[in-house]
Protein backbone atom coordinates (compact mmCIF):
# COMPACT_ATOMS: atom_id res chain seq x y z
CA UNK A 1 0.00 0.00 0.00
CA UNK A 2 1.39 3.43 -0.93
CA UNK A 3 1.64 6.29 1.54
CA UNK A 4 -1.03 8.34 -0.26
CA UNK A 5 -3.42 5.39 -0.27
CA UNK A 6 -2.95 4.83 3.44
CA UNK A 7 -3.22 8.52 4.32
CA UNK A 8 -6.55 8.84 2.53
CA UNK A 9 -7.89 5.95 4.62
CA UNK A 10 -6.49 7.52 7.79
CA UNK A 11 -8.24 10.82 7.01
CA UNK A 12 -11.61 9.07 6.69
CA UNK A 13 -11.10 7.25 9.99
CA UNK A 14 -10.13 10.53 11.63
CA UNK A 15 -13.26 12.31 10.40
CA UNK A 16 -15.48 9.50 11.67
CA UNK A 17 -13.76 9.70 15.05
CA UNK A 18 -14.32 13.43 15.32
CA UNK A 19 -17.96 13.07 14.35
CA UNK A 20 -18.51 10.60 17.17
CA UNK A 21 -16.64 12.77 19.64
CA UNK A 22 -18.72 15.82 18.88
CA UNK A 23 -22.03 13.94 19.03
CA UNK A 24 -22.26 14.57 22.80
CA UNK A 25 -21.17 18.18 23.25
CA UNK A 26 -20.73 19.85 26.63
CA UNK A 27 -23.38 22.29 27.77
CA UNK A 28 -23.35 25.62 25.94
CA UNK A 29 -21.47 24.34 22.89
CA UNK A 30 -24.35 23.20 20.70
CA UNK A 31 -23.54 25.71 17.94
CA UNK A 32 -19.94 24.52 17.79
CA UNK A 33 -20.98 20.89 17.71
CA UNK A 34 -23.60 21.51 15.03
CA UNK A 35 -21.11 23.26 12.74
CA UNK A 36 -18.44 20.62 13.34
CA UNK A 37 -20.80 17.73 12.61
CA UNK A 38 -22.10 19.43 9.48
CA UNK A 39 -18.55 20.11 8.35
CA UNK A 40 -17.58 16.46 8.82
CA UNK A 41 -20.57 15.34 6.75
CA UNK A 42 -19.58 17.70 3.94
CA UNK A 43 -15.93 16.60 4.12
CA UNK A 44 -16.96 12.96 3.80
CA UNK A 45 -18.79 13.95 0.61
CA UNK A 46 -15.57 15.64 -0.61
CA UNK A 47 -17.22 19.06 -0.40
CA UNK A 48 -14.19 20.52 1.26
CA UNK A 49 -14.81 24.22 0.60
CA UNK A 50 -18.24 23.99 2.21
CA UNK A 51 -16.81 21.95 5.06
CA UNK A 52 -14.19 24.63 5.72
CA UNK A 53 -16.95 27.23 6.07
CA UNK A 54 -18.68 25.10 8.69
CA UNK A 55 -15.47 24.52 10.64
CA UNK A 56 -14.71 28.25 10.47
CA UNK A 57 -18.17 28.98 11.86
CA UNK A 58 -17.43 26.57 14.71
CA UNK A 59 -14.17 28.42 15.42
CA UNK A 60 -16.02 31.75 15.47
CA UNK A 61 -18.47 30.29 17.96
CA UNK A 62 -15.63 28.91 20.09
CA UNK A 63 -12.07 30.03 19.28
CA UNK A 64 -10.79 27.43 21.74
CA UNK A 65 -12.23 24.43 19.88
CA UNK A 66 -9.18 22.33 19.05
CA UNK A 67 -11.35 19.85 17.15
CA UNK A 68 -12.70 22.58 14.87
CA UNK A 69 -9.13 23.62 14.02
CA UNK A 70 -8.13 19.99 13.45
CA UNK A 71 -11.03 19.34 11.12
CA UNK A 72 -10.53 22.56 9.20
CA UNK A 73 -6.88 21.65 8.83
CA UNK A 74 -7.73 18.22 7.38
CA UNK A 75 -10.18 19.81 4.91
CA UNK A 76 -7.56 22.34 3.81
CA UNK A 77 -5.02 19.55 3.45
CA UNK A 78 -7.44 17.67 1.18
CA UNK A 79 -7.39 20.77 -1.05
CA UNK A 80 -3.55 20.70 -0.89
CA UNK A 81 -3.49 23.96 1.04
CA UNK A 82 -0.68 22.63 3.16
CA UNK A 83 0.56 25.86 4.73
CA UNK A 84 -2.94 26.80 5.89
CA UNK A 85 -3.49 23.27 7.18
CA UNK A 86 -0.23 23.44 9.14
CA UNK A 87 -1.34 26.70 10.73
CA UNK A 88 -4.60 25.11 11.89
CA UNK A 89 -2.79 22.07 13.31
CA UNK A 90 -0.35 24.36 15.13
CA UNK A 91 -3.30 26.24 16.64
CA UNK A 92 -4.89 22.96 17.76
CA UNK A 93 -1.60 21.99 19.45
CA UNK A 94 -1.44 25.39 21.15
CA UNK A 95 -4.97 24.95 22.51
CA UNK A 96 -4.57 21.29 23.52
CA UNK A 97 -0.86 20.42 23.88
CA UNK A 98 -1.68 17.15 25.64
CA UNK A 99 -3.94 15.93 22.83
CA UNK A 100 -2.06 13.68 20.41
CA UNK A 101 -4.30 14.50 17.43
CA UNK A 102 -2.68 17.84 16.60
CA UNK A 103 0.77 16.25 16.47
CA UNK A 104 -0.58 13.28 14.54
CA UNK A 105 -2.25 15.39 11.84
CA UNK A 106 0.68 17.76 11.46
CA UNK A 107 3.08 14.82 11.33
CA UNK A 108 0.94 13.17 8.68
CA UNK A 109 1.03 16.38 6.63
CA UNK A 110 4.82 16.48 6.91
CA UNK A 111 4.97 12.91 5.59
CA UNK A 112 2.74 13.82 2.65
CA UNK A 113 5.16 16.64 1.80
CA UNK A 114 8.15 14.30 2.23
CA UNK A 115 9.46 16.35 5.15
CA UNK A 116 10.34 13.21 7.01
CA UNK A 117 12.66 14.61 9.66
CA UNK A 118 10.04 17.13 10.80
CA UNK A 119 7.42 14.39 10.73
CA UNK A 120 9.40 12.20 13.13
CA UNK A 121 9.27 14.78 15.91
CA UNK A 122 5.48 15.19 15.73
CA UNK A 123 4.72 11.50 15.29
CA UNK A 124 7.04 10.58 18.13
CA UNK A 125 5.17 13.02 20.37
CA UNK A 126 1.81 11.61 19.28
CA UNK A 127 2.98 8.07 20.04
CA UNK A 128 4.26 9.22 23.42
CA UNK A 129 0.92 10.81 24.33
CA UNK A 130 -1.10 7.79 23.19
CA UNK A 131 1.11 4.67 23.08
CA UNK A 132 -1.75 2.31 22.26
CA UNK A 133 -2.67 4.15 19.05
CA UNK A 134 -0.96 2.45 16.11
CA UNK A 135 -1.62 5.24 13.58
CA UNK A 136 1.23 7.43 14.86
CA UNK A 137 3.61 4.46 14.96
CA UNK A 138 2.63 3.42 11.44
CA UNK A 139 3.07 6.95 10.08
CA UNK A 140 6.44 7.16 11.80
CA UNK A 141 7.35 3.96 9.96
CA UNK A 142 6.47 5.69 6.68
CA UNK A 143 8.73 8.61 7.60
CA UNK A 144 11.57 6.23 8.49
CA UNK A 145 11.16 4.49 5.13
CA UNK A 146 11.43 7.90 3.48
CA UNK A 147 14.71 8.48 5.32
CA UNK A 148 16.00 4.98 4.53
CA UNK A 149 16.18 4.11 8.23
CA UNK A 150 15.21 0.49 7.62
CA UNK A 151 15.87 -0.92 11.09
CA UNK A 152 13.67 1.64 12.83
CA UNK A 153 10.96 1.27 10.20
CA UNK A 154 10.95 -2.51 10.64
CA UNK A 155 10.72 -2.05 14.41
CA UNK A 156 7.75 0.31 14.11
CA UNK A 157 5.78 -1.94 11.77
CA UNK A 158 6.58 -4.88 14.03
CA UNK A 159 5.18 -2.87 16.94
CA UNK A 160 2.00 -2.24 14.94
CA UNK A 161 1.68 -5.97 14.23
CA UNK A 162 2.14 -6.84 17.88
CA UNK A 163 -0.90 -4.71 18.65
CA UNK A 164 -2.87 -5.91 15.63
CA UNK A 165 -1.65 -9.21 14.09
CA UNK A 166 -4.25 -8.91 11.31
CA UNK A 167 -2.98 -5.61 9.92
CA UNK A 168 -2.39 -6.47 6.25
CA UNK A 169 -0.87 -3.07 5.43
CA UNK A 170 1.71 -3.34 8.20
CA UNK A 171 2.84 -6.71 6.82
CA UNK A 172 3.12 -5.20 3.33
CA UNK A 173 5.17 -2.24 4.56
CA UNK A 174 7.47 -4.41 6.65
CA UNK A 175 7.86 -6.69 3.63
CA UNK A 176 9.00 -3.68 1.62
CA UNK A 177 11.49 -2.80 4.35
CA UNK A 178 12.87 -6.35 4.41
CA UNK A 179 13.23 -6.31 0.64
CA UNK A 180 15.15 -3.04 0.88
CA UNK A 181 17.44 -4.77 3.40
CA UNK A 182 17.94 -7.66 0.94
CA UNK A 183 16.10 -10.01 3.29
CA UNK A 184 14.14 -11.47 0.42
CA UNK A 185 12.74 -14.56 2.11
CA UNK A 186 11.47 -12.49 5.04
CA UNK A 187 9.91 -10.06 2.56
CA UNK A 188 8.12 -12.90 0.77
CA UNK A 189 6.81 -14.21 4.09
CA UNK A 190 5.34 -10.80 4.97
CA UNK A 191 3.78 -10.41 1.52
CA UNK A 192 2.28 -13.89 1.93
CA UNK A 193 0.75 -12.90 5.26
CA UNK A 194 -0.58 -9.62 3.91
CA UNK A 195 -2.28 -11.38 0.99
CA UNK A 196 -3.66 -14.06 3.28
CA UNK A 197 -5.39 -11.37 5.33
CA UNK A 198 -6.45 -9.17 2.41
CA UNK A 199 -5.79 -9.89 -1.29
CA UNK A 200 -4.47 -6.72 -2.92
CA UNK A 201 -3.20 -6.33 -6.50
CA UNK A 202 -0.42 -3.99 -5.36
CA UNK A 203 0.92 -6.62 -2.98
CA UNK A 204 0.72 -9.35 -5.62
CA UNK A 205 2.75 -7.08 -7.91
CA UNK A 206 5.35 -6.39 -5.21
CA UNK A 207 5.71 -10.07 -4.38
CA UNK A 208 6.00 -10.91 -8.08
CA UNK A 209 8.69 -8.26 -8.52
CA UNK A 210 10.62 -9.74 -5.59
CA UNK A 211 10.40 -13.24 -7.05
CA UNK A 212 11.52 -12.16 -10.54
CA UNK A 213 14.11 -9.48 -9.82
CA UNK A 214 15.81 -10.79 -6.69
CA UNK A 215 15.14 -14.54 -6.55
CA UNK A 216 14.91 -15.32 -10.30
CA UNK A 217 11.87 -17.47 -9.52
CA UNK A 218 10.12 -16.63 -12.76
CA UNK A 219 7.29 -19.14 -12.41
CA UNK A 220 6.04 -17.69 -9.13
CA UNK A 221 6.64 -14.15 -10.31
CA UNK A 222 4.59 -14.77 -13.45
CA UNK A 223 1.75 -16.23 -11.36
CA UNK A 224 1.70 -13.11 -9.16
CA UNK A 225 1.75 -10.75 -12.14
CA UNK A 226 -1.10 -12.67 -13.74
CA UNK A 227 -3.11 -12.46 -10.52
CA UNK A 228 -2.48 -8.71 -10.39
CA UNK A 229 -3.80 -8.33 -13.93
CA UNK A 230 -6.86 -10.43 -13.20
CA UNK A 231 -7.77 -7.91 -10.52
CA UNK A 232 -6.51 -4.84 -12.38
CA UNK A 233 -6.27 -5.58 -16.13
CA UNK A 234 -5.16 -2.02 -16.97
CA UNK A 235 -1.98 -2.09 -14.89
CA UNK A 236 0.51 -1.21 -17.64
CA UNK A 237 3.63 -1.58 -15.47
CA UNK A 238 2.64 -5.10 -14.48
CA UNK A 239 1.91 -5.97 -18.12
CA UNK A 240 5.46 -4.98 -19.02
CA UNK A 241 6.95 -6.88 -16.09
CA UNK A 242 4.95 -9.97 -17.00
CA UNK A 243 6.34 -9.90 -20.54
CA UNK A 244 9.88 -9.57 -19.20
CA UNK A 245 9.40 -12.48 -16.77
CA UNK A 246 7.96 -14.69 -19.51
CA UNK A 247 10.89 -13.88 -21.81
CA UNK A 248 13.39 -14.59 -19.03
CA UNK A 249 11.72 -17.92 -18.27
CA UNK A 250 11.74 -18.89 -21.95
CA UNK A 251 15.45 -18.08 -22.18
CA UNK A 252 16.14 -20.07 -19.03
CA UNK A 253 14.31 -23.14 -20.34
CA UNK A 254 15.64 -23.00 -23.90
CA UNK A 255 17.60 -26.18 -24.89
CA UNK A 256 21.33 -25.78 -25.10
CA UNK A 257 22.55 -25.34 -28.70
CA UNK A 258 24.28 -28.30 -30.47
CA UNK A 259 28.09 -28.01 -30.32
CA UNK A 260 29.63 -26.63 -33.48
CA UNK A 261 31.86 -29.28 -35.10
CA UNK A 262 35.50 -28.41 -35.34
CA UNK A 263 36.52 -27.53 -38.90
CA UNK A 264 38.37 -30.31 -40.77
CA UNK A 265 41.92 -29.14 -41.35
CA UNK A 266 43.02 -28.80 -44.94
CA UNK A 267 45.60 -31.43 -45.94
CA UNK A 268 49.19 -30.18 -45.87
CA UNK A 269 51.71 -30.31 -48.74
CA UNK A 270 53.82 -33.08 -47.21
CA UNK A 271 51.45 -35.98 -47.65
CA UNK A 272 52.74 -39.46 -48.70
CA UNK A 273 51.14 -39.05 -52.11
CA UNK A 274 52.73 -35.69 -52.73
CA UNK A 275 56.11 -36.97 -51.58
CA UNK A 276 55.83 -39.96 -53.92
CA UNK A 277 54.95 -37.77 -56.88
CA UNK A 278 57.85 -35.48 -56.08
CA UNK A 279 60.28 -38.42 -56.03
CA UNK A 280 59.03 -39.69 -59.40
CA UNK A 281 59.38 -36.24 -60.93
CA UNK A 282 62.86 -35.93 -59.48
CA UNK A 283 63.95 -39.28 -60.92
CA UNK A 284 62.56 -38.36 -64.32
CA UNK A 285 64.43 -35.08 -64.27
CA UNK A 286 67.67 -36.85 -63.33
CA UNK A 287 67.19 -39.28 -66.20
CA UNK A 288 66.55 -36.53 -68.71
CA UNK A 289 69.59 -34.61 -67.57
CA UNK A 290 71.75 -37.74 -67.84
CA UNK A 291 70.61 -38.47 -71.38
CA UNK A 292 71.12 -34.92 -72.55
CA UNK A 293 74.54 -34.81 -71.00
CA UNK A 294 75.63 -38.05 -72.75
CA UNK A 295 74.48 -36.80 -76.11
CA UNK A 296 76.42 -33.58 -75.79
CA UNK A 297 79.63 -35.43 -74.85
CA UNK A 298 79.48 -37.73 -77.97
CA UNK A 299 79.16 -34.86 -80.45
CA UNK A 300 82.28 -33.22 -79.23
CA UNK A 301 84.29 -36.43 -79.72
CA UNK A 302 83.00 -36.75 -83.29
CA UNK A 303 83.97 -33.18 -84.09
CA UNK A 304 87.43 -33.71 -82.75
CA UNK A 305 87.80 -36.97 -84.74
CA UNK A 306 86.73 -35.37 -88.00
CA UNK A 307 89.32 -32.64 -87.60
CA UNK A 308 92.28 -35.06 -87.48
CA UNK A 309 94.71 -35.58 -90.45
CA UNK A 310 94.22 -39.03 -91.75
Please annotate each region the language model reported:
Residues 32-33, 66-67, 100-101, 134-135, ...:
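Helix-start (N-cap) detector for alpha-helical repeat units in TPR-like alpha-solenoids
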Residues 40, 74, 108, 142, ...:
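Residue-level recognition of tetratricopeptide repeat
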Residues 44-45, 78-79, 112-113, 139, ...:
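Register position in tetratricopeptide repeats
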Residues 53, 57-60, 91-94, 125-128, ...:
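Conserved structural position within tetratricopeptide repeats
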Residues 297-310:
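Cytoplasmic C-terminal tails of single-pass
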